[in-house]
Amino acid sequence: MQAYHLLLVCMYISCSAYTNASTAEDPNPNTYAEFSRMSHAAKDNGESNRALRTHNPDREERMMSLASLENWHAKLMGKTFEQVNSMFNKGKFNPPKGTTVGQATDWTWSKTIAFFEQMKKDNTTPESLKETLNIAQKEATMSAKALRKDPDYLMYNAFKTFWDNKSPGV
């Protein structure tokens, strides 16, 4: 469930960053010619929200509009954690009643940081964690896609990011 909340936060950040990106001020608008053609093809296709990724219309793929994704996220953030748990039928941990998804995400981050602080006090370094979890071997044998799904690799990356961003005196 912690990973789910982190995914929601990342999704929200990427959606808001995409919304703020403006192609109108780009000094080279020809860069977007291919996207423009694809956009016009979708509009000619009955104003449906589709994009043709291939020349074969049978392999057409539906795309969720950014506005509907942001709308869904806004509705989700207003719900309590119990409501979200019942929606997804997960219920991995149960915070106090009335806790919102944002508060649960903050709680998850605080627990993760506390765990990393304890690892740091136990003299765990990114190098020792990399050796313990055999990360070098995984990097050599696994694809990038497989590494992104490996929990040990994800934990190592999160701990390394934490380690790099914390000042030595903290």
UniProtKB/Swiss-Prot annotation:
UniProt keywords, alphabetically: Host cytoplasm, Host nucleus, Secreted, Signal, Virulence
Cellular location(s): Secreted; Host cytoplasm; Host nucleus
Keyword Aminoacyl-tRNA synthetase annotated: no
S-S pairs: none
Residues of the signal peptide: 1-17
Induction cue: Expression is induced during host plant infection.
UniProt key word Transmembrane helix: no
Domain notes: The RxLR-dEER motif acts to carry the protein into the host cell cytoplasm through binding to cell surface phosphatidylinositol-3-phosphate.
Known function: Effector that enhances P.infestans colonization of Nicotiana benthamiana leaves.
Protein name (record): RxLR effector protein PITG_07555
Organism the protein comes from: Phytophthora infestans (strain T30-4)
